[in-house]
A protein has these predicted regions:
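Active-site glycine-centered loops adjacent to acidic/histidine catalytic or metal-binding residues
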Residues: 37, 177, 236
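Active-site core segment of subtilase-fold serine proteases
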Residues: 2-104, 111, 121-143, 202, ...
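Stable alpha-helical elements in mature extracytoplasmic
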Residues: 8, 43, 79-83, 118, ...
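Hydrolase catalytic cores
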Residues: 84-87, 93, 106-112, 144, ...
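Sec-exported extracytoplasmic/periplasmic mature domains
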Residues: 88-92, 101, 127-135, 163-170, ...
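Catalytic-core segments of hydrolase enzymes
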Residues: 83, 122, 138-227, 269-277
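Extracytoplasmic low-complexity repetitive segments enriched in small/polar residues
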Residues: 14-25, 30, 34, 117-135, ...
């Protein structure tokens, strides 16, 4: 799993587990990552116990559910389960491990079995994730990190949901898109969101990864979980995005474990871009943004902040 090594997550686990226990792996009672996608196969051996709550919004809100009947959020496509494994696959000696292998996940199913969906459903999913199981935004069960491996055109409804999540302190992370375009798709292009481009294991940005991201992460031939206890390789900025979501979860869990407050979305973006490993031309550039996200440097820097 070169991809987990590249973002230096195992170095966080080994450096901080003796002082902070499970927080070094992303576990904290107040830290949840919402995976806004096609659903999650919560029965997968590598995701056992990871998903605690779910939301479904499909067909422009015609199909809607929020609660703990996780079957309703099962993944008929595979994409969401693959993304979820990159964030949170458990360290159980089998299969794969995620960036934050003890973090809690919320399955927010807004894309159909074909992987497509309505921006209105994505927006609804974001809002429900922020409210969390108790239905009230601004409480400890809100999603702290919202991971969005999806993209499309601008939509006022979508932007309103992004602004809502941001106003409640949710760290929003999104795939830059795979169109080979000069700018990220939406929601990644919104200033409140961290846009993630892809690199391969040779640190090259593939031609399809949209330019001008904030940061990059591994996104080519990533091995992760698939439904029915399977595994497989997938490529795309969809795979890069959850690496960053996992790093953000590690930062928040460790800050809380250290008795500090959560980082605001702006502070998190600053920490992740400042500590990223600069690739390509010095400083920000259109291919790599600020560089490869670095979990170890990000945590170290975040814990040095008040």
């Amino acid at each position: 799993q070169w991809n987990i090594e590249y973002v230096r997550a195992p170095e966080v686990w080994s450096a901080y587990s003796s002082s902070y226990g499970d927080a070094a792996y992303g576990y904290h009672v107040q830290v949840q990552v919402a995976v806004v996608d096609t659903g999650i196969d919560y029965t997968h051996r590598d995701l056992s116990g990871a998903v605690t709550w779910c939301v479904v919004s499909l067909s422009d809100g015609a199909i809607f559910y929020r609660g703990t009947d996780l079957k309703k959020c099962s993944d008929q496509n595979g994409h969401g389960t693959h993304v979820a494994g990159i964030v949170a696959a458990r360290l159980n000696g089998a299969g794969v491990a995620g960036v934050a292998p003890k973090v809690t996940l919320y399955a927010i199913r807004v894309l159909s079995a074909s992987g497509s969906g309505y921006l209105s459903d994505v927006a609804r999913g974001i809002v429900e994730a922020v409210k969390g199981p108790d239905g009230i935004a601004g409480t400890s069960d809100d999603a702290d990190v919202i991971s969005m491996s999806l993209g499309g055109p601008h939509s006022d409804t979508l932007y309103e949901a992004v602004r809502y999540a941001y106003s409640y302190g949710a760290v929003l992370v999104a795939a830059a898109g795979n169109e080979g375009a000069s700018t990220p798709s939406y929601p990644a292009a919104y200033p409140e969101v961290i846009a993630v481009g892809a690199i391969d294991s040779s640190y090259n940005v593939p031609s399809w990864s949209n330019r001008n991201p904030d940061v990059v992460a591994p996104g080519v031939s990533i091995y992760s979980t698939l439904p029915k206890n399977k595994y497989g390789y997938m490529s795309g900025t969809s795979m890069a995005c959850p690496h960053v979501s996992g790093v953000a979860a590690l930062v928040q869990a460790l800050r809380l474990a250290a008795g500090k407050s959560r980082l605001s979305p702006d502070a998190m973006k600053l920490v992740l871009t400042t500590t990223a490993r600069d690739l390509g031309p010095q400083g920000y550039d259109e291919l790599y943004g600020y560089g490869l996200v670095d979990a170890y440097s990000a945590v170290q820097y975040a814990l040095s902040q008040p």
